[in-house]
Every structure is written in C-alpha cells, then in structure tokens.
Amino acid sequence: MTVEFEECVKDSPRFRATIDEVETDVVEIEAKLDKLVKLCSGMVEAGKAYVSTSRLFVSGVRDLSQQCQGDTVISECLQRFADSLQEVVNYHMILFDQAQRSVRQQLQSFVKEDVRKFKETKKQFDKVREDLELSLVRNAQAPRHRPHEVEEATGALTLTRKCFRHLALDYVLQINVLQAKKKFEILDSMLSFMHAQSSFFQQGYSLLHQLDPYMKKLAAELDQLVIDSAVEKREMERKHAAIQQRTLLQDFSYDESKVEFDVDAPSGVVMEGYLFKRASNAFKTWNRRWFSIQNSQLVYQKKLKDALTVVVDDLRLCSVKPCEDIERRFCFEVLSPTKSCMLQADSEKLRQAWVQAVQASIASAYRESPDSCYSERLDRTASPSTSSIDSATDTRERGVKGESVLQRVQSVAGNSQCGDCGQPDPRWASINLGVLLCIECSGIHRSLGVHCSKVRSLTLDSWEPELLKLMCELGNSAVNQIYEAQCEGAGSRKPTASSSRQDKEAWIKDKYVEKKFLRKAPMAPALEAPRRWRVQKCLRPHSSPRAPTARRKVRLEPVLPCVAALSSVGTLDRKFRRDSLFCPDELDSLFSYFDAGAAGAGPRSLSSDSGLGGSSDGSSDVLAFGSGSVVDSVTEEEGAESEESSGEADGDTEAEAWGLADVRELHPGLLAHRAARARDLPALAAALAHGAEVNWADAEDEGKTPLVQAVLGGSLIVCEFLLQNGADVNQRDSRGRAPLHHATLLGRTGQVCLFLKRGADQHALDQEQRDPLAIAVQAANADIVTLLRLARMAEEMREAEAAPGPPGALAGSPTELQFRRCIQEFISLHLEES
C-alpha cells in the first residue's frame, strides 16, 4: 500500500485513514514475522538437537565397529555405514545453518531495524500532530482585542505546521520504503531456504546412490550368513550337550597344591587372588577384593574397571606376619610405615603362599631397587612407632640446622659404614638399636620383626629432632661394643660387604636374636671387695672443650659409690627446678614464651636433653657412668653437697640400699633402672641387650619402671630410647603415678610433650586422686598447664568429630594441627637449648 505525498501536505481525512491502515498492517506483519522467527528458531534448535543425537548414534556405531574388530564383515559394514551417516548428519547441519541465516537472522534483522525505525518515526509524527491540533485550538481562541496574544498564537501555529509537514513527508517516505522492503525480505529469505532444502536432498541422494551397490552386496551376504548361523547354532548345541555330560562326572574341589607365586614373572605380577580385607572404619568390616603383588607394590581392586588401590607403595618399607590372635582364621597382617592392613585368605595354604610371596617380593625389591632410586622421596610419613606429625618437615629442618639427616647421623663414630657388614655410606637405621645399616642388612633386620629391630630410612622417612638426637647419642661403635664384645672369642667371623646374604643373615640373627657375642657376666655370687663406680666429668662428643673456671664444673676425683652418683641427679634436678611461669599476657599465644625460654638458658640448666637448658658456657659437661658413659655434671658446690649427702662408702646407708656390686653383676632390670636414672644410653642399651625387661617394675623402689627413672633423671632422649624399645607410657608405680605424673611433678616440659605425643593418658589419677593437670595447677607450672589443657581440648574436639584412633593417641584431624605443632615445637625447643 502506497501513500501519496500530496495527501500528506493536505492532512486530509483520506491521509489519516491511509496512515491508520498502514500502521495496522505493519503491526500485524510484525507479529507474523516474530512468530515465524520463533518457529524457525525452534526448528533450528530441534534440528541441532537431532544433529547432536545423530552424532552420538554415529559414534555408537563406530564404537560397535571397534568392538567387532575380530569380525571383518561386521566391522567394515558398520564403519562404512557410520561414514555415510556422518555425511548425512553434516548435510543436516548445513541445512539448519542455512535456515538460521536465511529465515531467522534475515527476517529478525528486518523486524528489529526497519520496523523499529518505523515505530520510532510514528511516535514523533503522532506527537507533532497533537502539537498542531493544540496550536490550532490556541490560535482560534486568541481574543481580537489582544494583539500580542494573537501574534504569539499565530507564530506558534506557523512553526508547528511547518514541522508537521516536514515530518509527515518523512513519515510517508519511510512507509513507502518499508512496504517495498517487506516484499523483498520475505521472498528472498524463503527462496534461500528452499534452495537449501533442494541442495540437502540432492546431496543425500547422491551419497546414498553411491552406497547402493554395497548395500545390495551386503544383502546377499546376509542371506548366506543366516544359513551359516543356523549350521553353527546346531554345532554349538551339540558341543554344549557333550560338555554338560562330561561335567557331571567332574570333581570341583579346589586344588590348593596349584597355588604358587613367581617373583620373576614376565608380567610383573608375583601373585594375585582374592583376599578378605578388614576395613579401617569403626565397624571393622571385611570385604573381598582382588589383590596382587606387582612392581614392588601390594595393590587391590574390586572390579577390573576400577583403578588399582595401593596398599603398600614400597614393599621395602613393609613387613608381613601371620596373625593368630584374632577370631577369624587364615589371617595375616602387612605392616607399612604409615598403616597396617589385615588380610584373610581362604585356607591355610593360601595364607602361607601369600606370606611367602610378600617376603620374596620384599627381598626382590631390596635386590633390584637401590636406595638411590628413591632418594628424592624425602617427605614420606614416618613409621607409627615414632608418631610422626604433619609438621615434621619444619621441625626436622630446625633440628638439623643446615645439615642433612644423613650427614649428621653418619658423622657419629662408626656410622660411616654399616654396623653389621661394614659397607660404606649406610642409609638405613635401626632406631631402637641405634645402629646404621646398608640396604641389604636393613632388609634382614626388617625380617626379624619390629619387636627386635625397627628399620627406618635416613632418606625416605622424616625424622623428629628427638629421634635424630637419639641416633647421634649412640652409633655403631657404641652399640657394637655391646653386641660384638665377645665376637672373637665365639669363633665367628664378621661378614663383609661382599659376603652373601645368607652369611649376613646368620650373623645378624646370632648378634641380635641369639645374642651370642655379648660379654657374659661372671657367675661368682659376689666379689670379695665391693666395687664402686668412678664418677668423673667428661664432654659430650659434640661439645667443645673450654678451660675450667672457679665456678665451672670440676672433676670429681673421689671414688663415689654408684648410688651416690645416681641419686645426686634427682637432688640436682630438684635444686634447679625452673621457677619462671607464663605472664598473663603471654597466655594469649602458644609460643610467646619461646624467646624468653631461650634467652633465659643459664646455670639452672641441667642436661643436654632434659628440657631445662644447657650449661652457661655452651658445653655439655657430663659425669661418666661406668666406663665412657654419659650423665650430667654438677658444679663444685653441688658436688660437695652430693659427697656430703652420700657419705663414706662404709657408712652410707643409701649406697647399701642400692648395693655396691659391680655393674656387671647387677640384675639387668636393676641396671636398666640405674642407667636410665643416670642418663647413660650405652649402659641402658647393654641392660636391654642382656635381657632387661623394659617395663620391669622395681618393687623395692615403689614399683618404678625404667621410664620413670628416666623422667627422674631428666633425660628426654633416654625416654625416647625406652619408648622406641616398647616402654609402656601409661604404666604406673605403686603410688598410681605414670611417667606423665612424674614429669609434671618435676616440671619437665619436654618430657610432658613427649608423653602426650606418644598417647599418654592425662586423665589417670594417682593414689591422691590427682591427674597430671591437677598436679601442674598445684605446682603453678603455666606451660605444662597450658599444654595439658590444649591436649584435653584437642581430645574433646577429636571425640566431637568422631575421628578414629586409640584413646589418648594423637589423631590426624585438622583441628589438632595447632596442638601437635605446639607439642613438637616444645620438644624441638628443649633439644635446641642443649
């Protein structure tokens, strides 16, 4: 519909009617085009969904073709059909893209640009037309006797009429252009869409026409395939009947004699089979899983598609033993540095086979995997016997002070070579024996069991400062003086690095299990004259000698009774008990007193590892216990007091109570007590080697254990040594006091931290119905009170979170991280002050 420009100038009723008709037509065509665009969008979206689904279908056909690789007929057929269908899908995609461009985008552009511009011009035209009507009314209403108003109304009417005519001409022009463009846009878009449809079907026909000969050939092959399938079915039915008849007479009992393992299997799988595994949850459920030993690892999976779960990452760091103390039969346990795994076989023969397979794999891993291959794995979790914590890396760096663990431990006398075979550069250690070992000897030690030797790597495991210092206090030379004292007399020859594994294993078992080379104690009931121990001052290996001063520690030349020397330790500890407490402001921080503690290290310090500091001059002067042993020293004034309290040998009642027999004639348990009290690690190691029970309670001394004596002696390192050798941290004396009670009574913060770390029960009550916290509060020891309260808070948080773990032991909950760091910082602090 075209609007005449002349009618526009006249603004006649015909013009207005035409304008209204055109506007109505534009509104209707806009609605129709919007609907068509939406329908086209829906069609395109549905087409894209169809294309996406078709592509998935084609992908499924290709997967089926890959699955049928063994059958060339099916594989080739599916592959060709998948290629053809993929082309058809591509043609569909082209069709829908063309529909989107030709219909949706083109018509939508016409509606949004041209129709919108028409609407905006219409709004301006309507507004000007209203202004013209208003100007005409005002001009008609202007009074004759007011020329000023008449002139103003006339001028406004003239301007409004000019504006109306100008805008009306533009509006009519836009209407005519829109009417012409509407026809072109609609026809052009539909023509393009139909061309796309034509191209789609032509391409599809051409594609399928080329495939038609192959489809006819395949149809002929299918006819023959039906015949062949019928023949094959009859043959399979005949075989099925024959096999079913034969199995009726077969015995299905399982032949356990066929169970075997092969360490050198080409596939790398030493042994595999089903085992029951006890879960680590609170219910301890048992689940059947498929286990295998491969690549020096113990792994399992539930289904073939499941990823392998690694139980033991490195078999060199684990051990295996049968378990007879649980209710279920045929069980065995695999112990790794981080956890233990309880497994159950289906029979005794299978259990033996699995145990032997694990042991053989461990030996094979030692032979085939040198220690250097794993040297980069320095941050492995420590073994359970040492209760390693998450902050072990930080504390290790603090304890080593720039040296590596390997260099520091190897610098001890005798540690430059293996303590059993003499091979240079040993990188493994037995932490409860205090010796360094080569990789082959460490494997033999591991086979002895953790009750005999606890093996740890100097490069693969993390080392707590207290354990590192313990290793530096002993060493191969000191330990071999005990375990190889009568080596030459026994007629045995110590193996060398080139000796066979059998020779090394026999030697190690004779040395540590049979203990054939220990110096035997004389069998005489008593000596004619009582022997005494000479107590003299000596320096620790790592201290530097300095000239003595008037107030320095002096050499005690008089021969003191052994008991006087030992009992003086407790006297000195009581004398130098720390009296500094937290200030109220310091309680706001767990570590605020560290600097004050380090700055205040002075004469009140007693021993190098007691947690009470070191000597004022930086040296670690000690008293010799027996021959070449290490105990703490006393000042000149304290030595006099000790001599005065002990008295002469003939009249000293305390010495008579302890006995004046030679150390070699002491009961091993009593020797362990005295050595622990005197902080003499070599003597304590000798006592344990001679059969001393680590938890032996001395009935004549209120049932105290060696661990309690170590607390009274004030040595954190001796406590660590006893704990590594199986000391019970919760065993009480006749007064109901555990080691934690005694450490709290004496204000030994470092030992309190060590016992809390090792799972000491802080709720235990003594005969006076006091727990360690009550004792610490009564003694006004702010640091121990703070530690015990933090321990209780951590325990309560662990119980609230239902974290697994034995009562009193430190669990791995993140809520305890700060407390565990605090514990380790305390221990590290007291070790560094020495």
UniProtKB/Swiss-Prot annotation:
Q: Where is the composition biased (Polar residues)?
A: 382-392
Q: Name one GO biological process term.
A: neuron migration
InterPro entries with a match to the protein in the record: ACAP1/2/3-like, ACAP3_BAR, AH/BAR_dom_sf, Ankyrin_rpt, Ankyrin_rpt-contain_sf, ARFGAP/RecO, ArfGAP_dom, ArfGAP_dom_sf
Region Disordered, residue ranges? 375-400, 633-653
Positions of the Arf-GAP domain: 403-525
Spell out the Pfam families in the cross-references: Ank_2, ArfGap, BAR_3, PH
ANK repeat locations: 702-731, 735-764, 768-797
Q: What domain of life does the UniProt record list for this protein's source?
A: Eukaryota
The reply to whether Transport figures as a keyword in the UniProt entry is no
GO cellular component terms, alphabetically, are: cytoplasm; growth cone
Question: Where are the C4-type-classified zinc fingers?
Answer: 418-441
One example of the protein's molecular function in GO is: zinc ion binding
Keywords of the record, alphabetical order, are: ANK repeat, GTPase activation, Metal-binding, Repeat, Zinc, Zinc-finger
Q: Where is the composition biased (Acidic residues)?
A: 634-653
Q: Which residues form the PH domain?
A: 268-363
Q: Where are the transmembrane segments?
A: none
Keyword presence, Repeat: yes
State its role.
Answer: GTPase-activating protein for the ADP ribosylation factor family.
Q: What is this protein called?
A: Arf-GAP with coiled-coil, ANK repeat and PH domain-containing protein 3
Species this chain originates from: Homo sapiens
Q: Which gene encodes it?
A: ACAP3
